[in-house]
């Protein structure tokens, strides 16, 4: 019985990692659905895919897809290293735990926003059940809710940083792909945040967590193995 909480954590570790992968896959499918429509939809004499604003948005979504993939892939890789661990957990496990929270939070939000955007690209047709794109938004919304809501990922990630020093492990992990100044600045920012009064620390945690996830994704993209 005393091992029950750890067995639950193992299930969540796997399911949150799977959620990261599912979010990337759904986002990629939504981008494809948007592309498939935009390349044939003519407005002002040319496909809307070639219109400057939408073209720029496609480029942004493809960049976000790469960032989401980087987070998901790193989460999978770390889980593969630590999934058989039992307490007391190693530093590598605590690094995985923070990565899983960052990945689940960021990739799920990516899936929701990308599916919503794909519906907008398809215009009125995007809202109709007869067309596939509206389904991706309905399915994307659950990805940010089950296996721990965004609030849960943020607060659990904060706890991993505060009690296990997981942010230090993460910054060390990212150091080979980062500028030393960036790493130092992030270390100071997180340290300052963890020193805030409890209510303020929680209230302001989302911007820190979101920025850290984005920074992590961008640094991982500099890893030549991705």
Question: Can you say where each PLM-predicted feature lies in the sequence?
Answer:
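Flavin-dependent oxidoreductase catalytic core characteristic
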Residues: 1-226
